[in-house]
Amino acid sequence: MNSLENLILVGVIKSCHGIKGHVMLKSFTDPATKILERNLVNESGANIHIKLISQNAKGELICTFNDIATRNEAENLKGYKIFCLRASLPELEEDEFYIADLTHLPILNQDHKEIGKIKNILNFGAGDIIEIEFSDQTTELLPCNKEFFPIITKDYVILNYQREA
């Protein structure tokens, strides 16, 4: 059994597709089909077997999943999370991070004072957006770029942004 610390979320089943038990898979890998090159597991560490049927214009994958053969079975998988083992992932270049490693990191201002944390990292197709939860419990969304986040480390993130009063 694997702890969630040893797993990286690489995809989620969005919905069923058609009547043969196919599922629509949102892959978090780049390119999306890279997910198929990994040993995939669920939260409990059980192996998952996925076979690509096709890819739509949004980059979502239409796949067969384990032994699912009917639409009814596939409908029960909506929201199902797919992981791979952290140890199986390639070494990252400098200034590259896995989303799982950035989520919940403290955010510091230019004076290195903690002002919040990364709540989530989102992508709606035009680039990564960082959702910040500030110390006063308010949240804001900012694009993930060097202008707003000039320094990102494995331990903290520096934010170059003045909030409106």
Swiss-Prot record:
It is found in: Cytoplasm. Signal peptide: none annotated. One of its GO terms (molecular function) is ribosome binding. GO terms for cellular component: cytoplasm; ribosome. Its main location: cytoplasm. It comes from the Bacteria. Residues 94-165 form the PRC barrel domain. The keyword DNA-binding does not apply. GO terms for biological process: ribosomal small subunit biogenesis; rRNA processing. InterPro entries: PRC-brl_dom (IPR027275), PRC_barrel-like_sf (IPR011033), RimM (IPR011961), RimM_N (IPR002676), RimM_N_sf (IPR036976), Transl_B-barrel_sf (IPR009000). Keywords: Chaperone, Cytoplasm, Ribosome biogenesis, rRNA processing. The keyword Metal-binding does not apply. An accessory protein needed during the final step in the assembly of 30S ribosomal subunit, possibly for assembly of the head region. Essential for efficient processing of 16S rRNA. May be needed both before and after RbfA during the maturation of 16S rRNA. It has affinity for free ribosomal 30S subunits but not for 70S ribosomes. The PRC barrel domain binds ribosomal protein uS19. Binds ribosomal protein uS19. Belongs to the RimM family. This is Ribosome maturation factor RimM. It comes from Rickettsia massiliae (strain Mtu5).
